[in-house]
Amino acid sequence: MFRLKLLLPSAALLLALGANAQDRKAVMPEPSDAGQARLMKEVRHELVMLPYYNVFDNLSYRVSGSTVTLMGQVTRPTLKSDAGNVVKRLEGVTQVDNQIEVLPLSPNDDQIRYAVYRAVYGHTSLSTRYGYQAVPSIHIIVRNGNVTLEGVVANEADKNIANIQANGVSGVFSVTNNLRVEK
């Protein structure tokens, strides 16, 4: 009887401590806003530092907790896998959802890419402001003769000039202008 009296409170204490430990495991703290901002900055840095990332590729991402979703279009399959690999290695990333689209190989699309590049970055107001960066801020995506302009420009006039220049290229079926204006 004496043993049972000692055993009963000990068992109750163990059960309470075990339940408390499980509660702490179930409620994992979400990354802080500062941690989320740090992770977003690191993801961006790693993506723009990829060796073959250029003006004909468009990479974007979304960070949700410790999961990073990669989106966009690239001209090389290796760039898709490289982007996923560098983001996986970042501290704080537990999962990478790589939704990057590899654009189809097409000599016609390649000709259009270079012609649109010359038209957009050959314009004096665009070349001096955007053309001399390591990775220019206006990205030119060509899929089956359809051009999409992605990136950021300083003002509405630059957005319109880029659109007009791209529309003037022979062989282009349509131009989608997704350029954003800085605020």
Indicate residue ranges for each PLM-predicted region.
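N-terminal targeting leaders
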Residues: 2-9, 18-183
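Repetitive helical segments and hydrophobic/amphipathic motifs
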Residues: 12-14
